[in-house]
């Protein structure tokens, strides 16, 4: 087959598949109003991660809003914000200095370094490029405002506890430094990872161990208290080749939740639970986990990853904010989704309009810098605070009438058609009672039919009397039956609520059975492992 034709055919298949993708387009009656981003930033967002964002003017937004930190323009290095931890702003920096052989003076070599990278001359680049982490105190009265620690390669995530700095580097190495002496206390490198998700989790210090979120889908647990730092456990979450870094990590007492883009792991009092799916983002709050998936699902789970509630939308969701018992998420085609945490079946959709001459979503797609914290969502140079969420509500729009109602059925017809039917019904008896012409030829027959028939004999009369008495006796029974028939049917809302409660009850029973089954499986597995170890010990003794 001709090679250009084959390439063209493949391209057509790919683009046709892209064109068939369904985008979120809610019906008019689903859009409740408009959600404005009324607050302005000085500049637009240039870069962001899970813990902060940098604006064009160097200002930094953290999890509590705009910080006092300003990253100035420096031609000798490039800085990126990693995290705010234990009173320090942590910055990762790439040095771009070049040493001139003739004058031994520093010169900017950013363009040359880029060219060398493109050519693949790694040795020359290493001579001219350096990497470091800078810790800047958020206390203006601190004795030492800045601490710089040199690194072997670029830092992706970091956190501080006391005098220790835990860093995960771009070569998938976990490092532990003494901040005062800048001494490397521990380092372990994993398998390299070529592509990673920008939502990178940070290391977490616990009482005696530090948990490193690695780039190859595992958690490295290092004991830093008892003697020299020593790795004591490797927890493999996922083994995918691409985008397999740990994107979320949180510790809550004896419970830990971690996630990659494909799997969630929950450790509850030593027991492990997994959930597999295409995971966009997640948020843990007060013992409950909220998950966004690639196919538009919003899931509510407990610690053992049992599904409590869910709603599926044909949408591409981004950001999770919980406020006033509601979950808010930003849809990439220009909508704010509001889900009631008490009733996942009911959700509201708000459209994000244009702001002045600035089109909020260019090409109806979320394609600019985004960052969110506990109460706010930042987009480009605007942000929405859900503590003061006041959408502009539209007038209530009813659902479009069905085909049957459009044909004119009384039960499901629109109100104005029902009124017409009522008018017709009221007119019909008037037409029957109209005075007919006297010489119509039917008068005599009508008069005859109206006359009561004479009672032919006494027996018939007594029978008629008995039937009347029986009718009078049966009258209460008939009234009772009529009353039973007239008992109003349960309201559709009540019926819906009852069915929903039954469904929830059945779901809860099913979850309880699944939980018991998992617990039994874990217990059997542990017993099996103990038995195998016991046998192995006996064999070694022999």
From Swiss-Prot:
Gene3D superfamilies: YVTN repeat-like/Quinoprotein amine dehydrogenase (2.130.10.10). InterPro entries: PGBA_C, WD40/YVTN_repeat-like_dom_sf, WD40_repeat_dom_sf. One of its GO terms (cellular component) is cell surface. Residues 457-467 have a biased composition (Polar residues). It comes from the Bacteria. Residues 399-542 are annotated as: Disordered. Residues 418-435, 447-456, 481-542 have a biased composition (Basic and acidic residues). Binds plasminogen, specifically, and in a concentration and lysine-dependent manner. Plasminogen is the precursor of plasmin, a serine protease that cleaves fibrin, fibronectin, laminin and vitronectin. Acquisition of plasminogen/plasmin could enable H.pylori to degrade host components. This is Plasminogen-binding protein PgbB. It comes from Helicobacter pylori (strain ATCC 700392 / 26695) (Campylobacter pylori). The gene is pgbB.
